[in-house]
From Swiss-Prot:
The keyword Disulfide bond applies. It comes from the Eukaryota. Its main location: secreted. CDD domains: Wnt_Wnt5b. GO terms for biological process: canonical Wnt signaling pathway; cell fate commitment; cellular response to retinoic acid; chondrocyte differentiation; fat cell differentiation; lens fiber cell development; muscle cell differentiation; negative regulation of canonical Wnt signaling pathway. Palmitoleoylation is required for efficient binding to frizzled receptors. Depalmitoleoylation leads to Wnt signaling pathway inhibition. GO terms for molecular function: cytokine activity; frizzled binding; signaling receptor binding. Interacts with PORCN. Ligand for members of the frizzled family of seven transmembrane receptors. Probable developmental protein. May be a signaling molecule which affects the development of discrete regions of tissues. Is likely to signal over only few cell diameters. It comes from Homo sapiens. This is Protein Wnt-5b. Disulfide bonds join 83-94, 133-141, 143-161, 217-231, 219-226, 288-319, 304-314, 318-358, 334-349, 336-346, 341-342. Belongs to the Wnt family.
């Protein structure tokens, strides 16, 4: 009997530890700036053990690649900022919480919003690591070694220092996915379905950066004659990556886990998602009202657009509760003039405008 009690207690503690780990995230590196590589003292382990939100596997990678951690933090921050831009006019606006969970309890639900957040943060890491390689900030990588594109004109040179998106992709996959791959849930369980969902969306985010990287060229020659061009691989602007992932969010596929431990479409009439698509396993919670159990902050106090019929319009944003009007003073640059040579001088103009907030 005592042995059964011990086994039950151990299982309970293991579940509690898993829940505690899941409540935190490596995303918290965005909110807690990581020291630059040159600032590390000898011996990485104490530094890595103090970083919040890392899983055991990610902590080991931190010890092996300590100089990467600052750029993982930058990538997470880039992803969060892009998330907030893309959802700035939605009921859920990608708000962050002041703790290691970053987004609060809302991320415990396998919704479309969670899918997008995983994708855009994984994309942010690929972006940051790829660029750090090009800039010579990491000892394990350098400029891109991508083969010369076949369609590049023969007289154009290939070999400028490009963004190392291959390395960025591989490292982001190893680090970001480590958290999911070390989990061991029963095959066909809801928990395993959530792991598969996260892995799919992480991959979709990484592929968005990888696929959108393109050839950039610079002209050389007397008086801008462009008699010679040097070309290299360059990352797309991250805003374009965010736009692409937002499109994937809008067309995300509803999935469920099978007994064999695979994800399948809830509606088999829809097209099977590719590795570049987002998937979700839970319906989105009600973002209209504040709900501590789901993590929804509600829309009370949010600004809305009285004349818009879209999601930012007062009718939809305020969920039919109505809105309050108030006057706001806005200061803008105006009457700008160019002076030779070479600067622009502007005046400051104030304007009183009507604004609206949800009840």
């Amino acid at each position: 009997m005592p042995s059964l009690l011990l086994l039950f207690t151990a299982a309970l503690l293991s579940s509690w530890a898993q829940l505690l780990t899941d409540a935190n995230s490596w995303w918290s590196l965005a909110l807690n700036p990581v020291q630059r590589p040159e600032m590390f003292i000898i011996g990485a382990q104490p530094v890595c053990s103090q970083l919040p939100g890392l899983s055991p596997g990610q902590r080991k990678l931190c010890q092996l690649y300590q100089e990467h951690m600052a750029y993982i933090g930058e990538g997470a921050k880039t992803g969060i900022k892009e998330c907030q831009h893309q959802f700035r006019q939605r009921r859920w606006n990608c708000s962050t919480a002041d703790n290691a969970s970053v987004f609060g309890r809302v991320m415990q639900i396998g919704s479309r919003e969670t899918a997008f957040t995983h994708a855009v943060s994984a994309a942010g890491v690929v972006n940051a690591i790829s660029r750090a390689c090009r800039e010579g900030e990491l000892s394990t990588c350098g400029c891109s070694r991508t083969a010369r594109p076949k369609d590049l004109p023969r007289d154009w040179l290939w070999g400028g220092c490009g963004d190392n998106v291959e390395y960025g992709y591989r490292f982001a996959k190893e680090f970001v996915d480590a958290r999911e791959r070390e989990k061991n849930f029963a095959k066909g369980s809801e928990e395993q379905g959530r792991v598969l969902m996260n892995l799919q969306n992480n991959e979709a985010g990484r592929r968005a950066v990888y696929k959108m990287a393109d050839v950039a060229c610079k002209c050389h020659g007397v008086s801008g004659s462009c008699s010679l061009k040097t070309c290299w691989l360059q990352l797309a602007e991250f805003r374009k990556v965010g736009d692409r992932l937002k499109e994937k969010y809008d067309s995300a596929a509803a999935m469920r886990v099978t007994r064999k431990g695979r994800l399948e479409l809830v509606n088999s009439r829809f097209t099977q998602p590719t590795p570049e698509d987002l998937v979700y396993v839970d319906p989105s919670p009600d973002y209209c009202l504040r709900n501590e159990s789901t993590g929804s902050l509600g829309t009370q106090g949010r600004l809305c657009n009285k004349t818009s019929e879209g999601m930012d319009g007062c009718e939809l944003m305020c969920c039919g509760r109505g809105y309050n009007q108030f006057k706001s003073v806005q200061v803008e640059r105006c009457h700008c003039k160019f002076h030779w040579c070479c600067f622009v001088r502007c005046k400051k103009c104030t304007e009183i405008v009507d604004q609206y907030i949800c009840k």
